[in-house]
């Protein structure tokens, strides 16, 4: 028989840098799970990375937990690919960079397992939309 699920929490934590302070402690503390146990396991599974990692934590009735690591957000992958610090505050007026089709395909390939799309073409279109909303010019 499967364990009874009592909670489900989504977090975005820098790879290898989970600690009991907020946001981890405030999200997981009320659920009653071992926060240090989560932090140690998360850090072990994400060591050596420098990206923000989305994680989905499932909490069971016996206060045990499991978690699934997702791919980094598209905006983080775009910023890393272009080497920009942040997107534009006025994306329609101020552009912060240019991204090529090859770079979009590379990011879409990385992000594909977590995207809600069937083809690579639609994945590239989703990533291109994220880039445009950050003030990045998409070059075909």
Swiss-Prot record:
InterPro entries tied to this protein: Ribosomal_uL11, Ribosomal_uL11_bac-typ, Ribosomal_uL11_C, Ribosomal_uL11_C_sf, Ribosomal_uL11_N, Ribosomal_uL11_N_sf
Record-linked Gene3D superfamilies: Ribosomal protein L11, C-terminal domain, Ribosomal protein L11/L12, N-terminal domain
Keyword tags: Methylation, Ribonucleoprotein, Ribosomal protein, RNA-binding, rRNA-binding
PTM statement from Swiss-Prot or TrEMBL: One or more lysine residues are methylated.
CDD domains, A to Z: Ribosomal_L11 (cd00349)
Gene Ontology MF annotations: large ribosomal subunit rRNA binding; structural constituent of ribosome
SMART domains named in the record: RL11
Gene Ontology biological process: translation
Pfam families assigned to the protein according to its UniProt record, in alphabetical order: Ribosomal_L11 (PF00298), Ribosomal_L11_N (PF03946)
Keyword hit for Glycoprotein: no
Gene Ontology annotations for the cellular component aspect, listed alphabetically: cytosolic large ribosomal subunit
HAMAP family: Ribosomal_uL11 (MF_00736)
Function according to Swiss-Prot or TrEMBL: Forms part of the ribosomal stalk which helps the ribosome interact with GTP-bound translation factors.
Assembly information from the UniProt record: Part of the ribosomal stalk of the 50S ribosomal subunit. Interacts with L10 and the large rRNA to form the base of the stalk. L10 forms an elongated spine to which L12 dimers bind in a sequential fashion forming a multimeric L10(L12)X complex.
Family: Belongs to the universal ribosomal protein uL11 family.
Protein name (Swiss-Prot/TrEMBL): Large ribosomal subunit protein uL11
